[in-house]
A protein has these predicted regions:
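Glycine/proline-rich, positively charged
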Residues: 31-32, 68, 90-206, 212
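Active-site mouth loops of central-metabolism enzymes
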Residues: 26-38, 84-93, 216-218
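Short hydrophobic/aromatic-enriched beta-strand-loop microsegments
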Residues: 79-82, 165-173, 257-263
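Ferredoxin-like iron-sulfur electron-transfer modules
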Residues: 260-279, 291-310, 324-326
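N-terminal binding-site loop/beta-alpha segment at the start of enzyme catalytic domains
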Residues: 1-79
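Conserved, mostly hydrophobic/aromatic
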Residues: 11, 23, 47, 55, ...
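Conserved short secondary-structure transition element at the edge of the structured enzyme core
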Residues: 48-49, 162, 191, 195-257, ...
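Short catalytic-loop micro-motif centered on adjacent basic/acidic residues
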Residues: 53-58, 84-85, 144-148, 206-208, ...
Length: 326
């Protein structure tokens, strides 16, 4: 690993330069840790003070208050962070409204990066209205760069040949957890090849889920060694829930981390994000502990923590990466 946390790396052919690691704010939000706004904002400020300059959110994360408060705390001091956001909008009107909503919520005139969120196989044409809204927002100076986040190899391949696409935010980790091609599982090697193709085409690439939604945290350095050494990747987006998490990544990138160090994950629990769960039932037969069942209320997966042994097999089986550990 050669990049220090204070290094700045160009994203593709844009004029945006980011730290080798970014701060994904989803984990601190209401769907996971539910940190108080002041606490979360202080954590963001701490990360920025350590050298991180890249923050990722999304319309449905409901985490904008943390970022806005952090910017207020900074009061213009230091380097202005690069902010990325995303929308699940499918048509022009929804996407245009989402961009305005995000600008207001974040308290900024221009969002650095704005993406179509979780673009799946075959959806680019279906969501073309939303894509046009992103293009118009860029032309109007409301966003600086546009693209998509995705878990799908074929989407990365498709976007590599879309001239107006500046940025791709794909999922990749050494275990291949959550990587898809169409309706089937794909491998980390498949995604590596797609990323290399997109990078060669001038797309700016930063990646998600290096730690598999927390399920690979017990293999922290192995997972990060893989994530930070992928060809064509400018930055790796990680979630942080406390200062110690940030100190760990600083130590890792500075090369001062002990080779045998791994974070303590004994207090973490496997949980289902019901905003992503589709109730497909793929996770149930792989749980040898019988800890997973369907909720009578909404038909989505639930985990009985008294029976769960945190083996993580369910997370590996989940086709939509709805099972996380925190």
């Amino acid at each position: 690993m050669t990049n220090k946390i204070t290094d700045r790396i160009k994203l593709g052919e844009t004029d945006i330069y980011v730290s080798p690691v970014g701060f994904g704010v989803l984990p601190m939000g209401p769907g996971q840790l539910a940190l108080p706004v002041e606490t979360g904002a202080e954590l963001i400020v701490y990360a920025l003070e350590q050298g991180i300059n890249f923050i990722d959110t999304a319309q449905y994360y409901r985490t904008h208050g943390y970022i806005r408060r952090a910017l207020e705390m900074l009061g213009g001091r230091g380097e202005r962070p690069v902010i990325s956001s995303k929308t699940l909008a499918t048509d022009y009107e929804q996407a245009a409204a989402a961009i305005e909503e995000e600008r207001r919520a974040l308290g900024v005139e221009c969002i650095d990066i704005f993406l179509m969120h979780e673009l799946r196989s075959g959806q680019f044409a279906e969501r073309h209205g939303a894509w046009r809204a992103l293009q118009d927002a860029k032309a109007a100076g409301k966003v600086r760069a546009i693209g998509a986040s995705t878990h799908h190899v074929d989407v990365v391949e498709e976007l590599a040949s879309v001239p107006a696409c500046d940025i791709i935010f794909p999922l990749i980790n050494y275990a291949g957890m959550g990587i898809r091609r169409g309706r089937s599982a794909a491998s980390a090697a498949d995604m590596e090849q797609a990323i290399a193709k997109a990078s060669a085409a001038g797309k700016g690439i930063y990646t998600m889920k290096a730690l598999g939604g927390g399920n690979l945290a017990a293999h922290y350095q192995e997972a990060l060694n893989y994530a930070f050494s992928r060809q064509g990747v400018s930055s790796v987006m990680l979630g942080f829930g406390c200062r110690h998490d940030i100190d760990d990544i600083v130590s890792y990138l500075d090369g001062t981390m002990s080779p045998d160090y791994n974070p303590d994950v004994s207090s973490k629990r496997v949980r289902v994000n019901h905003e992503d769960c589709e109730g497909c039932g793929t996770c149930i037969p792989v749980c040898a502990s019988g800890a997973i069942s369907f909720s009578d209320a909404d038909g989505l997966a639930v985990i009985d923590q008294s029976r769960c042994v945190t083996c993580g097999y369910c997370a590996q089986a989940c086709p939509v990466r709805a099972i996380i550990m925190y």
